[in-house]
Amino acid sequence: MKCFKLVLLCVLAGLLVIAAAPARSQQMKPQPLTLGLQCTGGDCPLLKGIPQTAGMRSGFVRLEPGQTVGWHTTGKNEESLVILKGRGEARLEGQAARPFSAPALVYIPPAMKHNVANTGREVLEYVYVVAPATNVP
């Protein structure tokens, strides 16, 4: 009987916690915000996805001459790079490198392995935006 009362007490406590918590849709509703672009080097995430956004991620990258971000893929997501400063190239697996210089926009389709390199003599700075692709074959 003592064990039954303990289990019942735990169940009731759990129900109270669930009832007191806001609805999941209210917890995950993204809110407008403004972020600075201070980054001392490498990849500095800005928007980290759910629940901060509805699925989009974003960050600021600062590469010294000769540096790369490394080969990677964004899976089923597409990516845009907004080039703010410097020169570089987008290296896409199986394709010729695509050189760019600021100001520029680079688009990378879903599931494409890629790398970004600073090929210039000054710092390369860009903002990346990764978002779920809704029309992936």
Over which residues does each language-model region extend?
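A short beta-strand-loop-beta hairpin characteristic of the jelly-roll/cupin
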Residues: T68, E78-A102, M112
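Ligand-binding loop in jelly-roll beta-barrel domains
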Residues: P110-N135
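A short, N-terminal "cap"/entry segment at the start of jelly-roll beta-barrel domains
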Residues: F4, I18-R57, E64, G70-W71, ...
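Exposed loop/turn and edge beta-strand positions of beta-sandwich/beta-sheet ligand-binding modules
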Residues: R57, N77, P110
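Short histidine-centered beta-strand/loop micro-motifs
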Residues: L47-I50, V69-T74, L92, A117-T119
